[in-house]
Amino acid sequence: MRVSFLVPVYNTDPAILTLCVNSVLKAAAGIHEVVVVDDASDRADTRAFVDRCEKAGIDGLRIIRNSGNHGVSFSLNQAAHAASGDFLAPVDHDDVVVTPGFNQMLRSLAYHRSRWAYSDEIQVDEKGFLIRRMFKPDYSPQLLRSLMYINHLQVFSKDLFEDLGGYREGFEGSQDYDLALRMSERCTPLHVEEIAYHWRILDKTQSRSGEQLSASSVDNGRRALEEHFARKQCVAHVAPVLFKRHAHTEPEPIGVYRSRLAANQDSKVSVIIPCRLGTTKRINDKPLVLLEHCLQALGWSFVEKEASRVELILVLNAGDDLKKGEEAIVRRGL
């Protein structure tokens, strides 16, 4: 198993970029590959750092330069296209890969024969100090449809990535979320309970400015989720959840979405009632025929237009009279 780390670069502080590249080179350990794509940086010290990396002639380090500034999705696709590994691991240009956690991911992928895995991570500030640890749950499709909790580090099959067409341009800021939703339609990701990534939270990135998420990132995440439901042939209304961070500020999106799925008008529900005719029980000193009581409650529950989509199945004892069972249903108008 060979992994290609994909590192898109644009106007990155060389000090932070040095930490990032050194961390992935350490994790690569001369076995795996690191593909750095400079998306036409106009910052001189960033370009100078990329030049030094190229001239260093480090085994397993490849440098690609885009002819223009095309965005992160384009850059990641360029890196993936050039990658020689059979697995891919995207890494943000200001983050750090933790070697022991990455190695555990490789062992888990091999043991479980999985095509996609994600790890736990920690968030750090601009100087690398701990903000919070993020210990994630195992895969939950419902949770993924609410927020992009998988995040970093992800390692997934290049074949899977290419089958899906890679990252989609136009989803910048939420391109990882869009890809994760599409991959989840093909396979189930494996959660590796190891910290393999330091996610650096900067004041200003493509997806956020300070605490506030960018409007384009939130909207792209909403579109990715809506299209996911459409591919699943579900009708859903998706809206970002708003949260008031401070007493003096307006509610704002926090990267969480609420999806309301419309009921399928053609679907039917089968209500199965195993019973013995004539069975009674005293409730509040009042004898109740259990089947009659059950059917009465069901009748109260359905409106007329719903009743046509409900099927009642009575499972009676061998000695019971089927005709009496049918009569009980008719009496309740079901």
Where are each of the predicted segments found?
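Short, acidic, metal-binding catalytic loop of nucleotide-sugar glycosyltransferases
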Residues: 22-31, 293-309
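A conserved acidic beta->alpha catalytic loop
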Residues: 38-47, 68, 92, 313-329
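N-proximal low-complexity "stem/linker" segments adjacent to membrane-targeting elements
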Residues: 1-23, 240-297
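Short aromatic/hydrophobic "clamp" motif used to bind/position activated sugar donors
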Residues: 88
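Conserved nucleotide-sugar donor-binding catalytic segment
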Residues: 141-226
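Glycine-rich, basic loop-to-helix element that forms the pyrophosphate-binding segment
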Residues: 66-83
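Short alpha-helix within the catalytic core of nucleotide-sugar-dependent glycosyltransferases
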Residues: 21-22, 46-47, 77, 85, ...
